[in-house]
């Protein structure tokens, strides 16, 4: 089997040296991706296309599908490469190849020609088109919007009978631009923004801020691995997980409610910038869109950017949510995003949409920055190729109950402000308050002869914290969802 890879048009307008470099990198990327399907395949680069030849016919569909997902490819032609003698020979070979496809259809013939011949491309189109029209009674010629377009390519003494054309994702080959670090949460925005930078030629590493246990991290790892495996597997990348729970706890205890959102984002940018510097990455990528939430106003985004010299790229800055969701659907991350948890504990009641720099800096003076330094230092760096095995391991399941027994106690894990605004009272059972950000250090002080039913407003944080406690060896925890 043979495929002809056509380059993304922006590659073809580069200078000769840049174009050759891009083609060389794309050729290497294709080899890296396809070697898993057929180790004997050949990838040969030319000035305006790349040839892929493989022997294992059983891998035809898999190879074709993989090619459509490699950045830098405009479209793929599946071809049959045969010698020819003259125009009549071209017609006869085209008749054998296309007769069944043209029965009862309108068609036209389109020819591209390279080399020296005694005929032009239009001559071949007319001759082959006329012959097909005469020999297939139910077919008729239609030059605009036909049912079938017969694509032929003539190169010197070879004829390429094009059996199918398949669109690629375009963009630049990964590795032609510098590395970036994507702040990934597993939602719609961060997945799409990561894909957009891969498509633009960047090797995308991932940085995840874990706010609540293993279950969420496993979900985000699955998203990152999916994106890498589908669009970027030609290169090795990192998945860096930072336990941000201590940072969130410090913010909730010491920072004014209205400033929490902006300060949390500033802390994330500080942490990600340190990770980027550690690994020589040139820029951060976020999924922020202008005005989507309170921290994404121009004033707040400027304040967030000010905490670091690292370039922050926001490919979705002008996109609306519907457009982002449509893109997520196209690339296959929509289902992941819809089931990804949102946190009920890290939400300001009255977030500022126009933060003042002096106020933000005054609030940050209350923050213990040694906590931030520590979580960055302890960040977990994983080769994304190892994630497939890790995510297959079962997460410890935690029982969810809607009632309670005589030895049960409800543990309200909401933040202090939420508890004061909406105190939880349940008839017939004691309710104890312990904010989620103190569970890791204070849960062991509670009566371990009791069964603790964790509760929060949405049920997401309580489940994740229960999973975390189970991982720490506490088996006397359940999730309470009345």
Swiss-Prot record:
Q: Which UniProt keywords apply?
A: ATP-binding, Cytoplasm, Disulfide bond, Nucleotide-binding, Redox-active center, RNA-binding, Thiamine biosynthesis, Transferase, tRNA-binding
Question: Which parts of the sequence bind ATP?
Answer: 183-184, 265, 287, 296
Q: Tell where it localizes.
A: Cytoplasm
What is the E.C. number? 2.8.1.4
Instruction: Spell out the reaction equation it catalyses.
Output: [ThiI sulfur-carrier protein]-S-sulfanyl-L-cysteine + a uridine in tRNA + 2 reduced [2Fe-2S]-[ferredoxin] + ATP + H(+) = [ThiI sulfur-carrier protein]-L-cysteine + a 4-thiouridine in tRNA + 2 oxidized [2Fe-2S]-[ferredoxin] + AMP + diphosphate; [ThiS sulfur-carrier protein]-C-terminal Gly-Gly-AMP + S-sulfanyl-L-cysteinyl-[cysteine desulfurase] + AH2 = [ThiS sulfur-carrier protein]-C-terminal-Gly-aminoethanethioate + L-cysteinyl-[cysteine desulfurase] + A + AMP + 2 H(+)
All residue ranges annotated as the Rhodanese domain in the record: 404-482
Q: What disulfide bonds does the UniProt entry report for this chain?
A: 344-456
Give the EC class as a word. Answer: transferase
UniProt-listed Pfam families: ThiI, ThiI_fer, THUMP
What this protein is reported to do is described as:
Catalyzes the ATP-dependent transfer of a sulfur to tRNA to produce 4-thiouridine in position 8 of tRNAs, which functions as a near-UV photosensor. Also catalyzes the transfer of sulfur to the sulfur carrier protein ThiS, forming ThiS-thiocarboxylate. This is a step in the synthesis of thiazole, in the thiamine biosynthesis pathway. The sulfur is donated as persulfide by IscS.
Gene3D superfamilies for the chain = 3.30.2130.30, HUPs, Rhodanese-like domain
Q: What is this protein called?
A: tRNA sulfurtransferase
Give a GO biological-process term: thiamine diphosphate biosynthetic process
Q: Which NCBIfam families match?
A: ThiI_C_thiazole, tRNA uracil 4-sulfurtransferase ThiI
Under SMART domains, the record lists: THUMP
Mainly localized where? cytoplasm
> Which GO terms label this protein's molecular function in UniProt?
ATP binding; CCA tRNA nucleotidyltransferase activity; sulfur carrier activity; sulfurtransferase activity; tRNA binding; tRNA-uracil-4 sulfurtransferase activity
Gene Ontology CC annotation, any one: cytosol
Q: In which pathway does it act?
A: Cofactor biosynthesis; thiamine diphosphate biosynthesis
Result, substituting residue 321 to R: Approximately half of wild-type activity
What's the encoding gene here? thiI
User: SUPFAM superfamilies of this UniProt entry?
Assistant: Adenine nucleotide alpha hydrolases-like (SSF52402), Rhodanese/Cell cycle control phosphatase (SSF52821), THUMP domain-like (SSF143437)
